[in-house]
UniProtKB/Swiss-Prot annotation:
Organism: Clostridium botulinum (strain Hall / ATCC 3502 / NCTC 13319 / Type A)
Lineage of the species this protein comes from: Bacteria, Bacillati, Bacillota, Clostridia, Eubacteriales
PROSITE patterns the record matches: CARBAMOYLTRANSFERASE (PS00097)
One GO cellular component term: cytoplasm
Name this protein carries in UniProt: Ornithine carbamoyltransferase
Sorted UniProt keywords: Arginine metabolism, Cytoplasm, Transferase
Record-level Gene Ontology MF annotations: amino acid binding; ornithine carbamoyltransferase activity
Keyword Transcription: no
Catalytic activity: carbamoyl phosphate + L-ornithine = L-citrulline + phosphate + H(+)
Keyword Cytoplasm carried by entry: yes
Localization per Swiss-Prot or TrEMBL: Cytoplasm
Main subcellular localisation: cytoplasm
Stored SUPFAM superfamilies: Aspartate/ornithine carbamoyltransferase
Amino acid sequence: MFNLKNRNFLTLMDFTPKEINYFLDLARDLKRAKYTGTEVQRLKGKNIALIFEKASTRTRCAFEVGAKDQGAHVTYLGPTGSHIGKKESAADTARVLGRMYDGIEYRGFGQEIVETLAEYAGVPVWNGLTDEDHPTQILADFLTIREHFNKPLNEIKFAYVGDGANNMANALMIGAVKMGMDFRIVSPKEIPTDAALVAKCKEIAAETGAKVTITDNIEEGVKGCDVLYTDVWVSMGEPDSVWESKIKLLTPYRVDMNMIKMTGNPDAKFMHCLPAFHDEETAVGKEIKEKYGLSEMEVSHELFESKYSIVFDEAENRMHTIKAVMVATLGDQ
């Protein structure tokens, strides 16, 4: 039994492999309890603030449903509902909310903002996504891998394919080295992963038995992999020039049925944190088709809808793992 009461959840860098496994075991147990109607509420009477400087579907729903299941109350502060860094500093916001709430979730921009909230709030602070990291997503990913593979995480071969400089590449690499995985980032040289973070992760890998490979060679990068993972190539609000250059560089790295076959593993799975641009059924999808002539971006529609895809199991597990984080750090023991 681990006592994680009152701990912040800012990055998996702050947790040991045993503590990460504890979160995953707790999430598994909470999921089972929800399905069997035997869930015990450990957050009764708690008040939780959800700060969203960036819009969200999965993260917001996961925190709201998870909190409700556990008996907590939430207040949602959307992009127009909080004044962090505009009318009020992160430190002042933290000290105000910390007087009223038992826990605070933050989804937004720089990692330094969530770190400042944690420093000043006096209550547990949880990172729902920053520009540099996305630790709650990684717990969901690892729970999903556990459910689909009959082997421990330290025997998993995992390739993240696409934009090697984004927060998912960072977050997955941190989680993978903590858990002893064979982890590869397969990305064009022109989009490098943070060198200091790679160096730090390689240090951790030396202790845990993990492997870290950064390559632009798709065939080498995905060979023998259990999991191929990707994320969107560009974020909303980025200028057209960025879209054009990223699309040109990353189109060869689209994850498709051919790439799954390149793993040589008939049991390989495809994962994606969502939302995914895999068809023209959204306003963004239509815009991409009109501007760039692409009907799919980071993943082919065929693969997304195939038996290899476990993206909706992964999405559901956001809720169970986020619930586990709240219960472990805030719940009555």
